[in-house]
Amino acid sequence: EVFLMGCFSEILDRDILVDRVEKTRRLFAHLPEDALIVLEDGCYVKKDFRYYVHEQLCPHAHILSMNEDELQEYIGRRIDILDPDAVIPALETVHKNSGIPLVLVHSAAWALAYGDNAGMMRASLEGGVTMAASRFRSGDDINPQIYAQTAAMAPKEAAVTFCQQMRQQLGERICCVPCKDLSHVTNPTVVGLGDSF
């Protein structure tokens, strides 16, 4: 049902990258017609590799997923991730340039989907936020009870305001979920949070 393309940013040899991208493209013929194809972006060491991967795979993808750093690298500047007037143009740039119907971005403050049928991503965004927050506060010791406790935690107030403002400006084109308020966590795990998305 879902085909995730990722980890191309880990490849440092162009010949290997070209080979892996071509092998990935061949897999499309074996997917169900209604399969959802997701391209996971990355922080590429070799920036031209990112352009190549996007050029080759974006035409086949339904969702482009990235974190806040990858978003800012894409547009070539740092932005305030709690300022809708800065985030909206960034989303519009990625959406337009990639040609992918739906852009998913996860940050330390929120997770959002922008584009066609953004609302279909709400459960996935909420699940990603909850899983990342569970890992942040409990490391590898996540279990269903910890996940449920995390789901019940209050969100960051600034992120709630941001999501409300985004909805006011973009309507059905946006689905924005605030991250949990984890200011009380004294010994956080910060590695692997993005993998929740």
Show the residue positions of the predicted features.
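Ribokinase/PfkB-type carbohydrate-kinase core domain
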Residues: 1-196
